[in-house]
Amino acid sequence: LLEDRGVLKVGQNLKYDMLVLKRYGVRLTPLDDTMLMSYALDGGKGGHGMDDLAQRHLGHTCISFKQVIAHAPGKKAADKSFAGVPIDKAAEYAAEDADVTLRLWMILKARLVAEHMVTVYETLERRLVPVIVDMEHAGIRVERSVLARLSATFAQRAAEYEDTVYELAGKQFNLGSPRQLGELLFDDLKLPGGKKTKSGQWETRANLLDDLAANPDLPEDARRLIETMLQWRQLTKLRSTYTDALPGHIHPDTGRIHTSYSLAATTTGRLASTDPNLQNIPIRTKEGREIRTAFIAEKGNKLISADYSQIELRVLAHMADIPQLRQAFDDGL
């Protein structure tokens, strides 16, 4: 039935269900996904989860997962599991899920036809689902040893930067504390350009520190302190976000990272990657490019990188027919 091409399967965020079924060799087809139908129709109008859609189109408040899981045994939320939810409560939750999905499908399907969006949904959004399922299932291979080596290197360099900051500051303080850094720069050293937040704390955002370091009237030691502080921040961020965090996402059975791609999270049609986000691995810095070397192909294969250059602006230039913008692209600017 699940693979019968003569029977349409309707669901909400079917990518999740398809991934589970794929592990058991089942290929769900054909399908309609109410989340993607809503996204094709109302891409910039808020969330496309079932709770949001049920409220928006049906005026209905769905049973929340928190409510149903509360029926499971265990004193703390961390101790509770859906497997422990009584059958009658689980059945009510699942039945509502199916009922709401079908009612949403009838509303959204009619809108797709009325608003001439069937082609966009069927040829762009829906066709991408099985592709994304295969991508998530396959994952990407990551070399633990590369991440471990980079983590150690970054830690050593960060420690050196820390010592330099202490020397230039004339005292030790918590480099990870924006409050202590702000007090050092603007209270102790009396540097210009300081701004305070509503809570009365000095701002120490990276762009503010960049502007401060670019001040030609700044004493050289103060400039070096700020620049070294920014380098320390960069390295500690790379360690905590990538070299130390990514190994925890490597699946013990596959040895690969299986990120989750959302097809309905952006207003521009781009995918969003979470758990972990593999779309924001740095590339403009030397350290970022080193982190990228940890992502490797299986033996006998190669990784290929392909990207459109300024695709959104190019589409805008074409659709809006802006001569100056089109000329800028023609001139390679």
Explain the meaning of each model-derived region:
Residues 1-57, 139, 155, 284, ...:
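Conserved RNase H-like, two-metal-ion catalytic cores of nucleic-acid enzymes
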Residues 2, 295-296:
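Solvent-exposed alpha-helices and their adjacent loops that cap or buttress functional pockets
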Residues 8, 302-303:
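Structural motif
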Residues 14, 27-29, 45, 53, ...:
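Conserved "right-hand" nucleotidyltransferase catalytic core of DNA-directed polymerases
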Residues 39-43, 61-62, 290-293, 333:
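Short C-terminal domain-edge/linker segments immediately following a structured domain
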Residues 41, 249, 325-329:
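Short, contiguous acidic/charged loop-to-helix segments that flank catalytic cores in large enzymes
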Residues 51, 305, 312-333:
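Metal-dependent catalytic core segments for phosphate chemistry
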